[in-house]
């Protein structure tokens, strides 16, 4: 029964890479929208970052759930910790969007507001905007709608004291299969009918395989998930979609390799990469607010002689520099405040961080520092309603 006393440094590095991929895609989007319309769009690359996030989340949450165990009350500690970690920064960004629309709506992209959309955005519930699209007010928050649904399943598993994988596997698979039935228009609840849910399952399978030290069975299971995703994509478009199976296989292989090789090569991950991974949640949520400033400023001064790739490079570099600052001075204080409110007495009497405190520090993009002191208990193709590369709407 393996234990884990140190962080998964390679997983932390993957979080940084995943967030950076999304930022690159959005930097291209902002450049095309505000500076040079000929800037190429790299939507598929952004998708890779999001799918990595989902797989990492599935992996981490299984380990966190095992760390909490099946003791009475573990489910509400888990739920409160998830809220403490995810909600504060997301609510802040959503509030900024609402305030911007109210105060200067003509200057804001996607500035339509309705009470229903605002409430749904704060509650992580899918809803239609006035144009009929399904996304929250803070555009990149669409991934958190999936994350919160996944956390709800994890909470339910802990509450009824069942192995999270045993509960989540059939539900996530059914959600993926339901993508075949999803209408072009209809209830916003169809948002969950998407095969991206299987990335969470892949991460969970990796966690279970690592805990049981059964790499061969894990690889076979991941291959089955990839084939399932390829089959679903092929059925949706009525033609063979090999890439739809290859992409989840690659994502799974990357996370699998990061987990299994961490003890051997994880120590070589630089500190600045670890810091970037720690700030990945802030990078992901904050960059839509600041990244458009670079191309907009260059356009305002008429610097159209600057090549688009220079604009994109400056934008990405600026966001990577700002993210640790936002993490330290905004994200972390907000999380600490929420933790004090929702998780009183999180520190144990011996000064060791309790499981719930460890969970609190792990956001939807977090992984490296949550899988500590664990013990064993037993045993890409997105659908049309998902914006490629998490296209920014914030």
What are these regions (language model features)?
Residues 41, 48, 62-64, 75, ...:
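Membrane-interface helix-loop-helix regions
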Residues 1-10, 17-46, 62-76, 127-132, ...:
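Alpha-helical transmembrane segments in multi-pass integral membrane proteins
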Residues 358-360, 365-376, 385-393:
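Short amphipathic, helix-prone segments within low-complexity/disordered or flexible regions
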Residues 12, 16-19, 50-51, 57, ...:
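Residues within membrane-spanning alpha-helices of integral membrane proteins
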């Amino acid at each position: 029964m393996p234990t884990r006393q140190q962080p998964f440094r390679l997983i932390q590095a993957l979080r940084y890479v995943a967030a950076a991929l999304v930022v690159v895609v959005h930097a291209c989007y902002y450049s095309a929208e505000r500076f040079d319309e000929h800037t190429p769009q790299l939507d598929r690359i952004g998708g890779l970052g999001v799918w990595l996030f989902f797989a990492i989340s599935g992996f981490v949450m299984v380990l966190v759930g095992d760390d909490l165990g099946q003791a009475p009350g573990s489910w509400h500690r888990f739920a409160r910790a998830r809220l403490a970690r995810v909600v504060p920064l997301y609510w802040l960004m959503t509030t900024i969007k609402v305030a911007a629309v109210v105060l200067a709506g003509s200057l804001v992209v996607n500035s339509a507001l309705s009470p229903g959309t605002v409430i749904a955005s704060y509650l992580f519930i899918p809803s239609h905007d006035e144009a009929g699209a399904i996304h929250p007010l803070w555009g990149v928050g669409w991934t958190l709608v999936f994350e919160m649904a996944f956390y709800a399943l994890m909470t339910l598993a802990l509450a009824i004291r069942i192995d999270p994988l045993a509960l989540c596997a059939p539900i996530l698979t059914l959600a993926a299969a339901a993508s075949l039935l999803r209408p072009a228009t209809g209830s916003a609840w169809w948002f969950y009918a998407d095969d991206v849910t299987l990335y969470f399952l892949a991460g969970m399978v990796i966690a279970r395989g690592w805990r049981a030290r059964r790499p061969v069975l894990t690889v076979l299971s991941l291959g089955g998930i990839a084939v399932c995703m390829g089959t679903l994509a092929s059925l949706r478009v009525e033609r063979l979609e090999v890439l739809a199976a290859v992409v989840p296989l690659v994502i799974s292989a990357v996370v699998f390799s990061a987990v299994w090789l961490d003890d051997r090569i994880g120590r070589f991950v630089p500190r600045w990469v670890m810091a970037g991974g720690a700030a990945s949640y802030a990078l992901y949520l904050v960059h839509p607010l600041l990244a458009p400033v670079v191309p907009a400023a260059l356009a305002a001064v008429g610097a159209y002689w600057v090549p688009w790739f220079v604009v994109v490079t400056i934008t990405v570099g600026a966001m990577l520099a700002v993210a640790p600052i936002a993490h330290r001075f905004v994200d972390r204080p907000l999380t600490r405040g929420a933790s004090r409110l929702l998780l009183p007495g999180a520190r144990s009497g011996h000064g060791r961080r309790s499981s719930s405190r460890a969970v609190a520090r792990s956001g939807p993009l977090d992984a490296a520092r949550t899988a500590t002191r664990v013990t064993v208990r037993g045993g890409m193709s997105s659908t049309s309603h998902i914006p490629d590369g998490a296209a920014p709407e914030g």
